[in-house]
């Protein structure tokens, strides 16, 4: 069990307003995505649509500017038809469709990959629902669930994004009672990664804010 953290005075009021609590809670039950049930053979879809930041990519990936969207959509459709249960291919088809302005068509594919606990898909579809990017429907409460789960599966963007969004009140109205100790564990795990400059700055900022919330000087 982790110790309960006393949040007093102004910090206590902030916690109530942000929907952040500090109960006695179990340590985060970290999960790991297992890609072994799915083919790891490189496909044309991987060549055209892998994301550089996807931890489960099988090639270095392409930025959105480097992608030929028509080609990516075509080859990913073909490859997914050959391997319909592969969450990596589902995600990459969804990525291509989203960039092409076809987010309504993309969402079922990325939701399918998220349901299979593909970390990149969980974070990205959560982000889409949070921001309404590419004209996707806004659903901040669903976003909270997905981004948190991506953090539990170790996705760096989720490990840093979820605490930041919670502390900034982005999930307000969702009935979320985020555990401060969980948020600290997310940030701590992210800190152990090989961070580039901007993520490292965000880690430092989040650590300061969490200490303030906990009343630790």
Which residues are covered by each model-predicted region?
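N-terminal leader/linker segments that initiate helical-solenoid repeat arrays
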Residues: 25-75
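Short helix-capping/linker turns of helical repeat alpha-solenoids
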Residues: 41, 82-87, 115-122, 131-133, ...
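Terminal, low-structured helical/coil segments at or just beyond the last alpha-helical repeat
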Residues: 30-37, 41-44, 173-217
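"A position-specific structural signal for the A-helix of alpha-solenoid helical repeats
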Residues: 92, 124, 161, 206-209
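Short coil/turn linking the two alpha-helices of tandem helical-hairpin repeats
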Residues: 50-53, 98-101, 126-137, 163-174, ...
């Amino acid at each position: 069990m982790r110790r309960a953290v006393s949040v007093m005075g102004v910090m206590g009021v902030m916690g109530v307003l942000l929907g952040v609590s500090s109960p006695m809670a179990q340590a985060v039950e970290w999960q790991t995505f297992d890609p072994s049930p799915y083919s790891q053979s490189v496909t044309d879809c991987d060549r055209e649509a892998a994301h550089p930041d996807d931890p489960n990519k099988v090639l270095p990936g392409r930025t959105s500017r480097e992608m030929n969207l028509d080609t990516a959509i075509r080859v990913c459709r073909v490859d997914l038809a050959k391997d319909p249960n592969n969450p990596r291919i589902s995600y990459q088809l969804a990525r291509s469709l989203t960039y092409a302005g076809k987010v309504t068509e993309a969402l079922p594919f990325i939701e399918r990959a998220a349901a299979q606990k593909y970390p990149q898909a969980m974070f990205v579809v959560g982000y889409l629902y949070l921001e309404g990017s590419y004209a996707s429907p806004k659903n901040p409460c669903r976003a909270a669930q997905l981004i948190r789960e991506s953090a539990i599966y170790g996705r760096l963007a989720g490990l840093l994004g979820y605490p930041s969004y919670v502390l900034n009140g982005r999930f307000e109205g969702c009935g979320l009672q985020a555990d401060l100790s969980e948020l600290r564990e997310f940030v701590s795990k992210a800190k152990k990664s090989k961070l580039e400059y901007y993520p490292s700055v965000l880690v430092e900022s989040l650590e300061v804010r969490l200490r303030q919330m906990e009343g630790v000087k």
